[in-house]
Amino acid sequence: MSIEVGQKAPIFTLPTDEGEMLSLDDLKGKKVILYFYPKDDTPGCTKEACGFRDVWSQLSKAGVVVLGISKDSVKAHQSFKQKYNLPFTLLSDKDNTVCEQYGVMVDKNRFGKKYKGIERTTFLIDEEGVISAVWPKVKVDGHVAEVVGRL
């Protein structure tokens, strides 16, 4: 299932990097940048997270919420967040339920080994909970600027 512009964003509840539960439904009335990434503390994922960190003051002043989602554990998210001073929330989707809902789980092949993994994807969700932009197969360079430009 892939999510397209104009669709209602699938509602989910996941544990945050602080171990609390967060529901997308709780963020109605705010713009949300929801970005899915493969793994904490890897080169591309770190660069993407630090990109959002570096424009955080601009985003927070505009009332925009940034949420990062991966399969990493709450503990891994805590370490990643602390190591890179990330000011936004990271969510743990250990069983890939939300990744599947949003259609970001894809077949991958690394060194001949086939597996299911997260395809780096960003969704912009408007104040009504509707998808207003989608960036599939994200290339990290220039991505954050492109997202900010759509706000």
From Swiss-Prot:
Reaction(s) catalysed by this chain's protein: a hydroperoxide + [thioredoxin]-dithiol = an alcohol + [thioredoxin]-disulfide + H2O
Keyword Nucleotide-binding carried by entry: no
One GO-annotated biological process of the protein: cell redox homeostasis
GO cellular component, one term: cytoplasm
Disulfide bonding pattern of the chain: C45-C50
InterPro entries, sorted: AhpC/TSA, Peroxiredoxin_AhpC-typ, Peroxiredoxin_BCP/PrxQ, Thioredoxin-like_sf, Thioredoxin_domain
Alphabetically ordered keywords of this record: Antioxidant, Disulfide bond, Oxidoreductase, Peroxidase, Redox-active center
Active site: C45 (cysteine sulfenic acid (-soh) intermediate)
Enzyme category, top tier: oxidoreductase
Any GO MF annotation of the entry: thioredoxin peroxidase activity
Domain Thioredoxin: 3-151
EC number from the UniProt entry: 1.11.1.24
Keyword Oxidoreductase: yes
Subunit structure: Monomer.
Family membership: Belongs to the peroxiredoxin family. BCP/PrxQ subfamily.
Described function: Thiol-specific peroxidase that catalyzes the reduction of hydrogen peroxide and organic hydroperoxides to water and alcohols, respectively. Plays a role in cell protection against oxidative stress by detoxifying peroxides and as sensor of hydrogen peroxide-mediated signaling events.
Miscellaneous field: The active site is a conserved redox-active cysteine residue, the peroxidatic cysteine (C(P)), which makes the nucleophilic attack on the peroxide substrate. The peroxide oxidizes the C(P)-SH to cysteine sulfenic acid (C(P)-SOH), which then reacts with another cysteine residue, the resolving cysteine (C(R)), to form a disulfide bridge. The disulfide is subsequently reduced by an appropriate electron donor to complete the catalytic cycle. In this atypical 2-Cys peroxiredoxin, C(R) is present in the same subunit to form an intramolecular disulfide.
PANTHER family in alphabetical order: AHPC_TSA FAMILY PROTEIN (PTHR42801:SF4), THIOREDOXIN-DEPENDENT PEROXIDE REDUCTASE (PTHR42801)
NCBIfam families on file: PRK09437.1
Name of the molecule in the record: Putative peroxiredoxin bcp
Native source organism of the sequence: Coxiella burnetii (strain RSA 493 / Nine Mile phase I)
Originating gene: bcp
